[in-house]
C-alpha cells in the first residue's frame, strides 16, 4: 500500500509541476453593470460598464464556470439578481440560471474550455484562450456553444495559457 501511495504522490507531483495558474481577464462591454460569478474560483463581484478585472485560477482546477449576473442588488453580501442568481449570494458556491456559462478545466499540458447555454442564455459572450480559438456567443442559438449535454463544443488550449471573457462584445 505504501508503494501505491508513493507512486500516486509522484504522479500528482509531476502533473502539478507541468501546470501553472491561469489568469482570466473579464471585461464588461455592456452598457450596464454585470456581476461576474465563478465556481469553484472567483466567487462574485461587481463589474461596472467598460471595466475589466482578473481572476487567478490555480492549476488543476476542473469543472470551473464563470458567468455574468444582471439586474443585481446586494446588501452585506446578500441580495438577488434578475439573471444568473446563485441563491441570493454575492460570492457564489453554485451556478445560477439562466446564464451563459464560460466553462473550463486547467490541466497540465492541455486545458479545455467552452461556452454553454444548456442552463439558459442571459448575456452575449466571447471566450478565448491565448493559444486557441475565440468562441463567440451572441444569442441562445450560437453555434460555438453547448446546447445539450451530448454536444461536442469543447475546445483544447495549450497548458499555461491565459483567458479572456468579454460580456456584450
UniProtKB/Swiss-Prot annotation:
The keyword Signal applies. GO terms for biological process: defense response to fungus; killing of cells of another organism. Residues 1-21 form the signal peptide. Keywords: Antimicrobial, Fungicide, Pathogenesis-related protein, Plant defense, Signal. SUPFAM superfamilies: Osmotin, thaumatin-like protein. The keyword Zinc does not apply. InterPro entries: Osmotin/thaumatin-like_sf, Thaumatin, Thaumatin_CS. Associated with resistance against stem rust fungi. Belongs to the thaumatin family. This is Thaumatin-like pathogenesis-related protein 1. It comes from Avena sativa.
Amino acid at each position: 500500500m505504501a508503494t501505491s501511495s508513493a507512486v500516486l504522490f509522484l504522479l500528482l507531483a509531476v502533473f502539478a509541476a507541468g501546470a501553472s495558474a491561469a489568469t482570466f481577464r473579464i471585461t464588461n462591454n455592456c452598457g450596464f453593470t454585470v456581476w461576474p460569478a465563478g465556481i469553484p474560483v472567483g466567487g462574485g463581484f461587481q463589474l461596472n460598464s467598460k471595466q475589466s478585472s482578473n481572476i487567478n485560477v490555480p492549476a488543476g482546477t476542473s469543472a470551473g464556470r464563470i458567468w455574468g449576473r444582471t439586474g443585481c442588488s446586494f446588501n452585506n453580501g446578500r441580495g438577488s439578481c434578475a439573471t444568473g442568481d446563485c441563491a441570493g449570494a454575492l460570492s457564489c458556491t453554485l451556478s445560477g440560471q439562466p446564464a451563459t456559462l464560460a466553462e473550463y478545466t486547467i490541466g497540465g499540458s492541455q486545458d479545455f474550455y467552452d461556452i454553454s447555454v444548456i442552463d439558459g442564455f442571459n448575456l452575449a459572450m466571447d471566450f478565448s484562450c491565448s493559444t486557441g480559438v475565440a468562441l463567440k456567443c451572441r444569442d441562445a442559438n450560437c453555434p460555438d456553444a453547448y446546447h445539450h449535454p451530448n454536444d461536442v463544443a469543447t475546445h483544447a488550449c495549450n497548458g499555461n495559457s491565459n483567458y479572456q471573457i468579454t460580456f456584450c462584445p
